[in-house]
């Protein structure tokens, strides 16, 4: 493999030193490779080699840091093969493991650990788990509100705040505002100061000049942008008037109105008062009549333009600016000040209490990482030490940095002696791919440097543009450039997309003999959704297809066309490993969606309907899965059974298996009370008939289980209890047998893991765990289903655009382009912005009316522009994931009406679309389709808009290539029929096969097929250790084909027993129950043991019969024995520990052929009576109450050896420690027996 040929710009990014360097790396430009090469060059420099641990490399994720280390390691290894004796390279390989290649959070954490004493932090601090911090925040915010409601603390400002921003029924909405505002300000360098400054913006007096405020500037800029759009429309109208005979009467009026708009634009650039006065005088005269115009179509178009301009200017812009005088604005601000101050005080109070609570618990959270680090770096000696250590700081994905992270980097950067500016920071990223504003990323940090840094060699602050794309085909790059050169600007996108920002071809794809099967134009497929007006005749299938399904089904057909040679020509992709073209596979195709919520499940279902293997990587839906809702309902009723909804959910589930009719009977027993009361009444009711007796027993059985589980939940850790419920109820195995069983079981495992994390916190108990889960749903959103897919699985992946960032795929299908942007946040009662502060609604409590304040209007405009800019960058990320083929799909309600709306693009003469029109776009199609309207390949769209072929339109000359198609429900269903016809034709081809045909034997063999692995279907999926012991001690256990694993009723039901005294096994169970619960912390006597058993009976842990069957003397003898004394001395004792582990079926059934059954696993479960730890290992102890004669100890050992060995193995897997000794304690003979 030859040496890498770096481009001129890449080489500059690798070689330039001695100044701050910003590398603007376009999508697919090889920025990671450049970053690695820059580091390698530095550590292998002959004159001034730099040790790898003298560099600070900051990455965005832990995965990126690991990949970076791996790449650097490989690069060093490669250099070592050239220079095997190089001590410098060997040293770098050694230093690599401790090199500072890390995320900013990891760097902050290391700085805190090394300098904790500067901020009075306990050196034994730990990182608070999300489980703990969610609960802690909830606890604190509730405590604050409770305190503030106390008469001595309650203020009118607080009550007004509650009135303003709480819902009608509770103050949860206000609590969430406080929590969200806390998260928001924590991305600033000084959160408390920012909050105070935000409140103080409302602290104004009568002399306040609103026109000088940031709010006024935003509104003026917005009005200027809107007016510019209206100006373009009026200029287009005047052009039509001048070019059309008979419209002269319109000329004077339109000209005057255009001049009026020009004056207003000048006013918007001048001052608030100038704009206010100008808009106050806006009037539109009556339009003169034109009787001689023969071109009625143009005349109507001109009138329509004027009506739109008039409506927008008078009803929207004028109303927005002139509704409030400056005096009224000042009054609103002054009235809002105490409310805003109260809100800020509330957030600061939360901040203080939360910090105090974390300190008391010895924990820190992720927000603390950056703020504590910044506080430590405020001590010059620490900053100086790090400044001297790091010769260069390299920041990856710089476009996603925030203000705190920027301050941290600047604190440790070396500085120019004269200017004081940083000189050793290398920043690489692409602001066009900054899509994490919701995580408080600040792309303006990148943009400020991008606009101020120079490209010259002598620049003290220098930038390099990497514009060559080494990922995608020319067709993809040309299409991306064609779109973004027209829509991305400083206003929307926050960057002017010009030649410097465009993508240029860097990849070299080999030629293929049939060019129609590779690459090709970008496809845009427009699908017409169901119109409001229903057709007179509509097929049943058309009626049941939802709009999302229509698009999903179309995408499925498109995938089949690409992959299935029977349906369409097989598309070819280039395989880098094979160094050749091959047929596209499902794993090469990714369907991207802006949001997977609601959409991904529909797409997955449609794929499955079309026999396409698909997997959706969704970020939500976890808490809505049946299995999780059922288990959470079970936990809720174990905590408190008097909750109707979760109780009914459990009763209807396979855990209890009650029928709807039985639930009705329960309700009828307690019509006015709760459902649990109904259950109790049925259980204690008089016998009526045979059916009622069985029903009553069913209720009693469930109540007994529920009471037992409630008792169990008190004494078991939550994670162990949840796993116990899975096994005890059989629900884990049940869901595994359903469709998608692996996914369902994986979801249950996630809940178990969450419980395990919860157990590590300072919170305990089932109630707190349920509270945590409920808070998690609200605060952190849904967790997303468990991941069960491997990277190499041959499936179509459906994922969000955010998840695809940094990845690349041969074929991208970007769907749901007709889905409107989500602007719901703009409707919240209060908005906030790091530059503009608060934007609240005002609520007149006397008149009970709510209205939008001027500050809120300003914030809505600002946040909308920033949101649209983010959406534009998200679109850029999506389009640039494609290597070879890009397919776009989107649905619209009325395709002709939409096309007419998009045709505005044909009216402008500038290359860029009207920024006003781009701003009014509601979805991605509103940006993409106007662009393609202006392309020679956009003829389909122009025809839909009613533009005749002979009409003169302004088309742009461009190398991009597009294929536009339109479809609707009927067309998609017809395609279904055509696909089915193809399959039917294949069947007909083999219909008349004679016996002598070469197919006969194959068909005969298939029809008489016998499953080769029939025995595997008879293997159990789960065994208890007791069953395993019984089988292995049986001479028949190797006969795995017997149906001995089918559950059998081997015990007579209790209600049929005449003599209800406890049998031997039941006595053993009673002894185990007592040994599990007995408190041996004090010196025991027979009286103590009897007293404890009485308490166990009172608490219903054991029955009176069970207590009577246990001899207290036997228990006392145990504790006097050698093994009992050792147990009493042990510090860590575990009793009744449930476990599960997987074993290979060939280990259990040794006669099974390994080559066939090697991958067949069986789940083993059991409960270990007792084990305890000593210094040199673990001692396992199992209690037995078997009757035996003197001298039969060896028989007992033989009987239980298998069981004890599995217990020991389970303990070693659970603890990672060695089981040094294994004992049976035989209560019958008061003997301990060691099992070797």
From Swiss-Prot:
Cofactor(s) named in the record: Mg(2+)
Keywords for this protein: ATP-binding, DNA damage, DNA repair, DNA-binding, Exonuclease, Helicase, Hydrolase, Isomerase, Nuclease, Nucleotide-binding
Gene3D superfamilies from the UniProt entry: 3.90.320.10, P-loop containing nucleotide triphosphate hydrolases
Domain (UvrD-like helicase C-terminal): residue spans on this chain: 512-806
Amino acids binding ATP: 25-32
GO biological process: double-strand break repair via homologous recombination
HAMAP family associated with the record: AddA
Annotated function: The heterodimer acts as both an ATP-dependent DNA helicase and an ATP-dependent, dual-direction single-stranded exonuclease. Recognizes the chi site generating a DNA molecule suitable for the initiation of homologous recombination. The AddA nuclease domain is required for chi fragment generation; this subunit has the helicase and 3' -> 5' nuclease activities.
Subunit composition and interactions: Heterodimer of AddA and AddB/RexB.
Protein name in the entry: ATP-dependent helicase/nuclease subunit A
Gene name linked to the record: addA
């Amino acid at each position: 493999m030859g040496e890498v040929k770096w481009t001129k710009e890449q080489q500059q990014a690798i070689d330039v030193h001695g100044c701050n360097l910003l590398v603007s790396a376009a999508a697919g430009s090889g920025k990671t490779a450049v970053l690695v090469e820059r580091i390698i060059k530095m550590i292998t420099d002959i004159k001034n080699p730099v040790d790898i641990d003298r560099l600070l490399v900051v990455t965005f994720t832990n995965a990126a840091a690991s990949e970076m280390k791996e790449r650097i390691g490989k690069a060093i290894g490669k250099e070592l093969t050239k220079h095997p004796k190089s001590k410098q390279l060997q040293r770098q390989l050694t230093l690599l493991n401790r090199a500072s290649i890390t995320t900013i959070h990891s760097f902050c954490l290391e700085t805190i650990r090394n300098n904790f004493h500067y901020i009075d932090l306990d050196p034994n601090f730990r990182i608070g788990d999300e489980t703990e911090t969610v609960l802690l925040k909830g606890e604190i915010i509730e405590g604050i509100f409770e305190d503030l409601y106390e008469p001595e603390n309650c203020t009118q400002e607080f009550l007004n705040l509650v009135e303003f921003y709480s819902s009608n029924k509770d103050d949860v909405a206000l609590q969430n505002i406080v929590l969200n505002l806390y998260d928001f300000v924590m991305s600033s360098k000084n959160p408390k100061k920012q909050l105070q400054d935000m409140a103080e913006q409302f602290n104004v007096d009568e002399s306040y000049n609103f026109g000088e405020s940031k709010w006024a500037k935003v509104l003026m800029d917005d009005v200027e942008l809107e007016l510019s759009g209206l100006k373009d429309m009026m200029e287009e109208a005047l052009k039509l008037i001048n070019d059309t005979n008979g419209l002269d009467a319109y000329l004077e009026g339109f000209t005057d109105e255009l001049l009026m708009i020009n004056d207003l634009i000048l006013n918007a650039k001048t001052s608030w008062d100038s704009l206010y006065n100008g808009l106050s005088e806006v009037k539109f005269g009556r339009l003169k009549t034109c009787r001689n115009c023969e071109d009625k179509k143009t005349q109507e178009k001109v009138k329509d333009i004027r009506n739109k301009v008039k409506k927008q200017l008078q009803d929207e812009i004028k109303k927005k600016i002139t509704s409030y005088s400056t005096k009224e604005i000042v009054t609103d601000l002054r009235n809002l000040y105490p409310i805003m101050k109260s809100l800020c005080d509330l957030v600061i109070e939360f901040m203080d209490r939360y910090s105090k609570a974390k300190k008391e618990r010895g924990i820190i959270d992720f927000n603390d990482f950056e703020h504590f680090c910044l506080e430590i770096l405020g001590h010059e000696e620490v900053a100086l030490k790090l400044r001297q250590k790091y010769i260069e700081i390299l920041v990856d994905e710089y476009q996603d940095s925030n203000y705190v992270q920027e301050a941290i980097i600047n604190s440790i950067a070396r500085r120019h002696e004269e200017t004081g500016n940083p000189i050793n920071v290398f920043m690489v990223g692409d602001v066009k791919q900054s899509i994490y504003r919701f995580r408080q990323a600040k792309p303006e940090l990148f943009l400020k440097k991008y606009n101020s840094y120079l490209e010259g060699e002598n620049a003290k602050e220098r930038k390099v543009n990497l514009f060559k794309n080494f990922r995608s085909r020319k067709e993809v790059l040309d299409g991306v450039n064609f779109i973004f050169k027209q829509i991305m600007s400083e206003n929307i996108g926050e960057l002017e997309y010009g030649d410097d920002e465009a993508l240029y071809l860097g990849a070299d794809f080999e030629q293929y003999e049939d060019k129609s099967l590779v690459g090709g134009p970008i496809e845009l497929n427009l699908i017409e959704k169901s119109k409001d007006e229903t057709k007179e005749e509509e097929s049943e299938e058309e009626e049941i297809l939802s709009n999302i399904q229509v698009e999903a089904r179309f995408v499925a057909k498109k995938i089949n066309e690409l992959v299935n040679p029977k349906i369409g020509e097989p598309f070819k992709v280039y395989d880098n490993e094979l160094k050749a073209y091959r047929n596209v596979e499902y794993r090469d195709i990714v369907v991207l969606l802006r949001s997977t919520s609601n959409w991904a499940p529909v797409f997955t279902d449609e794929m499955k309907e079309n026999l396409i293997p698909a997997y959706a990587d969704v970020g939500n839906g976890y808490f809505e899965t049946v299995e999780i809702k059922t288990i959470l309902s079970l936990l809720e009723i174990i905590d408190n059974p008097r909750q109707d909804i979760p109780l009914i959910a459990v009763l209807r589930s396979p855990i209890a298996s009650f029928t709807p009719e039985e639930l009705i009977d329960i309700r009828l027993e307690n019509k006015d009370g709760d459902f649990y009361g109904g259950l109790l009444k049925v259980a204690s009711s008089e016998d009526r008939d045979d059916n009622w007796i069985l029903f009553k027993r069913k209720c009693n059985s469930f109540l007994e289980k529920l009471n037992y589980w409630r008792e169990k939940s008190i004494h078991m850790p939550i994670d162990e209890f949840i796993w116990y419920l899975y096994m005890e109820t059989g629900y884990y195995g049940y869901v595994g047998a359903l469709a998608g069983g692996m996914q369902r079981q994986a979801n249950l495992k996630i809940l178990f893991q969450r419980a395990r994390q919860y157990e590590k916190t300072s919170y305990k108990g089932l109630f707190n765990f349920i509270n945590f889960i409920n808070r998690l749903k609200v605060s952190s959103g849904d967790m997303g289903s468990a991941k069960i897919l491997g990277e190499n699985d041959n499936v179509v992946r459906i994922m969000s655009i955010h998840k695809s960032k940094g990845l690349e795929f041969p074929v991208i299908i970007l769907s749901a382009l007709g889905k409107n942007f989500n602007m719901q946040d703009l409707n919240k009662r209060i908005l906030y912005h790091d530059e503009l502060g608060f934007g609240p609604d005002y609520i007149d409590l006397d008149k009970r009316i709510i209205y939008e304040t001027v500050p809120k209007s300003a914030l809505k405009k600002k946040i909308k522009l920033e949101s649209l800019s983010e959406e534009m960058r998200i679109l850029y990320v999506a389009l640039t994931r494609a290597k070879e083929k890009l397919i776009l799909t989107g649905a619209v309600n009325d395709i002709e009406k939409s096309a007419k709306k998009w045709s505005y693009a044909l009216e402008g003469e500038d290359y860029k679309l009207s920024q006003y029109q781009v701003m009014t776009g509601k979805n991605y199609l509103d940006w993409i389709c106007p662009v393609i309207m202006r392309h020679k390949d956009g003829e389909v769209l122009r025809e839909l808009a009613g533009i005749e072929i002979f009409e003169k339109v302004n088309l742009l000359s461009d190398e991009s290539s597009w294929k536009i198609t339109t479809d609707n429900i009927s067309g998609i269903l017809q395609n279904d029929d055509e696909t089915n016809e193809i399959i039917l034709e294949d069947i007909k081809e083999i219909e008349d096969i004679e016996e002598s045909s070469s197919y006969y034997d194959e068909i005969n063999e298939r029809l008489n097929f016998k499953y080769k692995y029939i025995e595997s279907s008879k293997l159990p999926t789960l065994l208890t250790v007791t069953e395993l012991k019984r089988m292995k001690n049986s001479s028949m256990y190797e006969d795995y084909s017997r149906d001995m694993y089918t559950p059998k009723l081997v015990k007579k039901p209790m209600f049929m027993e005449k003599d209800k005294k406890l049998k031997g096994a039941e006595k053993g169970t009673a002894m185990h129950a007592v040994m599990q619960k007995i408190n041996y912390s004090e010196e025991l006597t027979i009286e103590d043991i009897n007293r404890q058993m009485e308490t166990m009976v009172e608490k219903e842990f054991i029955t009176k019969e069970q207590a009577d069957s246990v001899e207290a003397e036997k228990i006392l003898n145990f504790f006097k024995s050698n093994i009992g004394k050792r147990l009493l001395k042990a510090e860590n004792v575990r009793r009744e520990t449930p476990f599960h582990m997987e074993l290979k079926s060939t280990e259990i059934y040794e006669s099974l052929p390994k080559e066939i059954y090697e991958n067949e696993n069986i789940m083993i479960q059991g409960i270990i009576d007792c084990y305890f730890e000593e210094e040199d290992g673990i001692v396992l102890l199992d209690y037995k109450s078997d009757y035996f004669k003197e001298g039969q100890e060896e028989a007992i050992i033989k009987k239980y050896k298998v069981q004890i060995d599995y217990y020991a193995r389970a303990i070693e897997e659970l603890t990672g420690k060695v089981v040094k000794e294994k004992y049976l304690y035989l209560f019958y003979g008061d003997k301990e027996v060691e099992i070797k």
